[in-house]
């Protein structure tokens, strides 16, 4: 199916809410402390990730939209770490610094994939003057297409009603990820996105979808919401709007590893899609697809445009099928971040036969992802002669992309893929035939980067040339 993503690059979104820094200390443990009956962790890895409203802003930026973040922080190392990390992913931070409070920080100590303890560094921001935040919102309303209020009940949204009214007067939709059961404080919001447990804490336990719809519509009327999106984990999402039939969307998740931060991804994609000019129904469709991707990752994560496009095509993973070179580089970087081994091969693949399929299947077994680089029509003609290719580039790439063994397909114009390989730098470069490894284009670059080069045998008796000769002979 042809998928057209929203024009995220022209979307502007402001996120206001409780920002926090998630810190992770990892290490092995092999003994019990002599001081107390607790394990001793030898910390060897430290990670810092934006959390809360900051993760929402990061999700919006990852789509290519203009993301601006407003929140309360202290004047400390955690605030500086947040600012730097977010600036690196193109989130514009406009924090209100509160010298009497620390930046909210959650430190987790983990060993052998188990969390041993969590330490929270925080003081509620209730009572802090909200006017500086109101000023930042008012200044931005003319340049944004959506306002997200991300509530973790830490005090940044103590004046949430004034924030909603500022946006409503400017005609800017307000999307809220709620906290707690006091939906009254969100009165007048455009869209509320509670998960099922948050929804039922207000509406009561629901036996079926009919009860969800009935009670959801009552909540919309009671609190003057324009719409309500109930996220229901493995049951997908339900969008409710006055005067319209409910829209039920089944989950698109293939595998669920971690639901951490999935709500941040949902509201981030919703806001960016609305700000790009799409309808609420379309925004929910893309948000549902994004949720299916992000729960397949460990920890709080974001979704790239490539991942989102492939998810709505029905293949919820990091980039599948035919790609441009720039898209492929992004997909490969994401795969490496997950620790996946990338294998790359190349060829003309003019008339796909059993030998090709067997070779590609064997290449795929050598790693986690397989890239197939394909000679363009002009490159093939120079290599094989004026009568080739039999099948044009687009058709060759589509057929290759449909193979289970192949993750990504990309084309190159040159006689050899050396430049392309040097730009991708796969972990393993594979070529079929009777080559020596040093004869393979791109081998020097791959070796220099610490990768490997391998030659695989083709299946005997299978060749495009022989197929063409047989066709010509049979037609005489």
UniProtKB/Swiss-Prot annotation:
Catalyzes the ADP transfer from ATP to D-glycero-beta-D-manno-heptose 1-phosphate, yielding ADP-D-glycero-beta-D-manno-heptose. InterPro entries: Bifunc_HldE, Carboh/pur_kinase_PfkB_CS, Cyt_trans-like, PfkB_dom, RfaE_dom_I, RfaE_dom_II, Ribokinase-like, Rossmann-like_a/b/a_fold. Pfam families: CTP_transf_like (PF01467), PfkB (PF00294). It is an enzyme of class 2 (transferase). The lineage of its organism: Bacteria, Pseudomonadati, Pseudomonadota, Gammaproteobacteria, Enterobacterales. Homodimer. GO terms for cellular component: cytosol. CDD domains: RfaE_like (cd01172). The keyword Lipid biosynthesis does not apply. Its EC number is 2.7.1.167, 2.7.7.70. It catalyses: D-glycero-beta-D-manno-heptose 7-phosphate + ATP = D-glycero-beta-D-manno-heptose 1,7-bisphosphate + ADP + H(+); D-glycero-beta-D-manno-heptose 1-phosphate + ATP + H(+) = ADP-D-glycero-beta-D-manno-heptose + diphosphate. Residues 1-318 are annotated as: Ribokinase. PROSITE patterns: PFKB_KINASES_1. Keywords: ATP-binding, Carbohydrate metabolism, Kinase, Multifunctional enzyme, Nucleotide-binding, Nucleotidyltransferase, Transferase. In the N-terminal section; belongs to the carbohydrate kinase PfkB family. In the C-terminal section; belongs to the cytidylyltransferase family. GO terms for biological process: ADP-L-glycero-beta-D-manno-heptose biosynthetic process. This is Bifunctional protein HldE. Gene3D superfamilies: 3.40.1190.20, HUPs. The keyword Signal does not apply. The active site is at 264. ATP binds at residues 195-198. GO terms for molecular function: ATP binding; heptose 7-phosphate kinase activity; heptose-1-phosphate adenylyltransferase activity; phosphotransferase activity, alcohol group as acceptor. Pathway: Nucleotide-sugar biosynthesis; ADP-L-glycero-beta-D-manno-heptose biosynthesis; ADP-L-glycero-beta-D-manno-heptose from D-glycero-beta-D-manno-heptose 7-phosphate: step 1/4; Nucleotide-sugar biosynthesis; ADP-L-glycero-beta-D-manno-heptose biosynthesis; ADP-L-glycero-beta-D-manno-heptose from D-glycero-beta-D-manno-heptose 7-phosphate: step 3/4.
């Amino acid at each position: 199916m042809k998928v057209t993503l929203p024009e995220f690059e022209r979307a502007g979104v402001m996120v206001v809410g409780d920002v926090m820094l998630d810190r992770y200390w990892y290490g092995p443990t092999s003994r019990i402390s002599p001081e107390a009956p607790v394990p001793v962790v030898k910390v060897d890895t430290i990670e810092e990730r934006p959390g809360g409203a900051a993760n929402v802003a990061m999700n919006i930026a990852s789509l290519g939209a203009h993301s601006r973040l407003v929140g309360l922080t202290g004047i400390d190392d955690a605030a500086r770490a947040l600012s730097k990390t977010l600036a690196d992913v193109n989130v514009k931070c406009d924090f209100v610094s509160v010298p009497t409070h620390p930046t909210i920080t959650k430190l987790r100590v983990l060993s052998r994939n188990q969390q041993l303890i969590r330490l929270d560094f925080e003081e509620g921001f209730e009572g802090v003057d909200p006017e500086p935040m109101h000023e930042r919102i008012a200044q931005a309303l003319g340049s944004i297409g959506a306002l997200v209020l991300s509530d973790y009940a830490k005090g940044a949204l103590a004046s949430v009603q004034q924030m909603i009214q500022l946006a409503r007067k400017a005609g800017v939709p307000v999307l809220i990820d709620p906290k707690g059961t006091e939906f009254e404080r969100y009165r007048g919001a455009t869209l509320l996105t509670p998960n099922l447990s948050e929804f039922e804490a207000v509406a009561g336990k629901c036996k079926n979808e009919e009860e969800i719809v009935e009670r959801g519509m009552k909540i919309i009327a009671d609190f003057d919401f324009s719409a309500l999106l109930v996220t229901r984990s493995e049951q997908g999402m339900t969008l409710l709007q006055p005067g319209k039939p409910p829209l039920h969307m089944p989950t698109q998740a293939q595998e669920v590893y971690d639901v951490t931060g999935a709500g941040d991804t949902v509201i981030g994609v919703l806001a960016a899609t609305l700000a790009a000019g799409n309808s609420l129904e379309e925004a929910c469709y893309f948000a549902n697809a994004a949720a299916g991707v992000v729960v397949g990752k460990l920890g709080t994560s974001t979704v790239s445009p490539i991942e989102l496009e492939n998810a709505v095509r029905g293949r919820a993973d990091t980039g599948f099928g035919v790609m441009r070179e720039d898209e492929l580089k992004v997909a490969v970087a994401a795969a490496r971040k997950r620790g996946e081994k990338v294998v790359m091969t190349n060829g003309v693949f003019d008339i796909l036969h059993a030998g090709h399929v067997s070779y590609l299947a064997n290449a795929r077994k050598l790693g986690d992802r397989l890239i197939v680089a394909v000679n363009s029509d002009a490159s093939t003609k120079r290599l094989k002669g004026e009568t080739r290719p039999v099948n044009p580039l687009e058709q060759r790439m589509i057929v290759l992309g449909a193979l289970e063994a192949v993750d990504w397909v990309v084309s190159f114009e040159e006689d050899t893929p050396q430049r392309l390989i040097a730009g991708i730098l796969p972990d393993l470069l594979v070529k079929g035939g009777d080559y020596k490894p040093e004869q393979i284009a791109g081998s020097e670059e791959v070796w220099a980067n610490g990768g490997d080069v391998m030659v695989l045998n083709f299946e005997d008796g299978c060749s495009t040339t022989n197929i063409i000769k047989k066709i010509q002979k049979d037609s005489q």
